[in-house]
Design a protein with these regions (language model features):
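Beta-strand->loop->alpha-helix junctions that form or flank phosphate-binding loops
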Residues: 18-23, 155-175
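Phosphate-binding loop of NTP-binding sites
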Residues: 1-142, 146-157
Length: 175
């Protein structure tokens, strides 16, 4: 945990603690389809993985579900990785780039890890779009008031695909 004395000493020395996803991402050129949100991550990740596999794509399932991304990159590499990302994993990502970032929603969760500060948790979730370029895609729930507020703070380079419950101006898709 981030509060462990050894981890604190390492961080105090300016050394980054990186997530397993950050580590593995350094050793592959595969396309990364990353899903985060407070709710619905596992279901969405599983459905996308299923669609990729049924369509005949070489895809691996990683993150909070499936096998370790690092293990797959080393021993069973895939052209695509469908990755469920928790806020914990996003916290320790610096150079990793999601080719497709999907942000489902942001609601209060795990606030004890974030000094009971909702904005700290929100900032962690928004890290999914860091390092994206104009060649990438960002899909997000346009009905979430927190996401809408946060988007105003970012210079998003990825092509945006907002979706909503009802057909509305500005949304690409609706359910």
């Amino acid at each position: 945990p981030d509060t462990a004395p050894m981890i604190r000493k390492i961080v105090e020395k300016g050394i980054h603690i990186i997530s397993e996803i950050e580590f593995a991402g350094r050793y592959t050129d595969s396309k990364m389809i990353c899903i985060t949100g407070s709710n619905g991550k596992t279901t969405t990740t599983s459905l996308i993985y299923h669609i990729f596999k049924e369509a005949g794509y070489d895809a691996g399932l990683a993150g909070n579900i499936g096998n370790s991304l690092a293990l797959q990159v080393a021993e069973d590499p895939h052209e695509y990785y469908i990755i469920e990302l928790s806020s914990f994993q996003l916290d320790n990502m610096y150079d990793f780039r999601a080719n497709i970032a999907i942000l489902l929603n942001i609601t209060p969760d795990h606030l004890d890890r974030y000094d009971n500060c909702m904005q700290n948790y929100v900032d962690a979730k928004m890290r999914i779009i860091q390092n994206q370029t104009d060649k990438d895609a960002f899909i997000y729930w346009n009905d979430d008031p927190i996401i809408k507020r946060e988007l105003e703070k970012y210079d998003i380079k990825a092509v945006q695909y907002p979706f909503s419950e009802l057909k509305e101006k500005g949304s690409i898709g609706y359910i």
